[in-house]
Amino acid sequence: REVEEGSVVVLCGKGNNGGDGWVAADYLAAQGVEVAVVAPVEPSLIRGDAARDAAKRACSVGIPVHVAPDYEELVALLVEADVVVDAVFGTGFHGVMPEPFDMWVEAVDDYFEGMVFSVDVPSGIDATTGQAEGPYFQADTTLTMFALKPGLIAGLGKQAAGQLVVASLVGDDEGSEELADSAR
């Protein structure tokens, strides 16, 4: 769905999937979309050079960053947003979603009424089995890289992923354009 004059909250994890979220935030801001990032740690503490560099780049262009917000602060951001980007966990996730991310899922479930856009796989869903051992994001659209993951077409993943978009990452702006269109 397209949102006129929309705003986006990007929920970023500490690893590579979070790095994808920082890149998405930077891309959206460059397109004139109002965007804010929620992160569990300061950008300098993000794991992986590429993810940390993406976070630093997003911060350098003035994207608002909310580090480890409490529940009320997160809810305040969510009720004003039109789109949430779930870039918390990716294909390597297994098990139960740890704190504070379980609280992020709860806040989105309870207070967010817009579109949820997951990066690679809805966080909380096992990309191999499609199962969840705890809370998970219910996406309207999931942008997955290169190919469908088995967990996106099996178990809870089949329902949690929403509409699936496969991006090649090489000269393929389909996913980026769809995300930007969702926020306009």
What is each model feature region?
Residues 1-42, 47, 141, 147-184:
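Small-residue (G/A/S/T)-rich helix-start motifs and N-terminal tracts that mark the onset
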